[in-house]
From Swiss-Prot:
Ranges of Polar residues composition bias in the record: 155-170
PANTHER family: COILED-COIL DOMAIN-CONTAINING PROTEIN 169
Family per similarity comment: Belongs to the CCDC169 family.
Assigned keywords, A-Z: Coiled coil
Protein name according to UniProt: Coiled-coil domain-containing protein 169
Signal peptide: none
Amino acid sequence: MKEERNYNFDGVSTNRLKQQLLEEVRKKDAVQLSIFELRHKITELEAKLNTDNEGSEWKTRYETQLELNDELEKQIVYLKEKVEKIHGNSSDRLSSIRVYERMPVESLNTLLKQLEEEKKTLESQVKYYALKLEQESKAYQKINNERRTYLAEMSQGSGLHQVSKRQQVDQLPRMQENLVKTGRYNPAKQKTVSAKRGPVKKITRPNHLPELHP
C-alpha cells in the first residue's frame, strides 16, 4: 500500500509559495521539453530501422545476395557435371583417352589453352565472390552495430522518461522540505501561535442605518 502524505503549508508566506511553485513549474517545463526531444529522436531512430522502404539498404543487400547465390548455384552445377564426366565408368575414360591420343598436337595445345583459360576464369570468379562475401559480412556487421546503438539510445530515452515521472511525483514534498530548511515554515510553531491567539472573533456590521432624531 502506498503511504498517504498530508501536506500543510500553514504559516508560509504567499510570495514564498509562489516562488517555490514557479521554480517547480520551470523544472517541470524543462523535463517535458527533454521528454519531447527524446520522443522525437526515438521516432527518427525507428524510421531508420524501418526496412519496408523500397530503397532501403537491407533490401539492396538482400537482392545482391540472391544474385550471388544464383551465380554460385550455376557454378556448382557446372562443376558437378565436370566431376561426373571425370568419375564416369572405365570404358568412358578409356574412350576419352583414345580420343585425345588420336588428336593432333596442335589440337591438344589448343584444348590445353582452353582448359587453362577456363581455370583462370573459375579462379577469378572464386576470388571475386570471396571478396564480395567478405564485404557483405563487414557491411552487415556495421549495420548490426548501428542497430544495437539505436536500440540502446531508445532504451536510454525510455529510462529518462520514467525518471522524469518520478521527479514530478516528488516535487511537492521537496517544496515543503525546502521551506522547512529555510526556516520559513514550522508546523509546530504555527500550531502554538494559533493556540495562543484563540478563536477568531467574527465582526458583525449592522444591516440598517441609524435613526435620525429631529
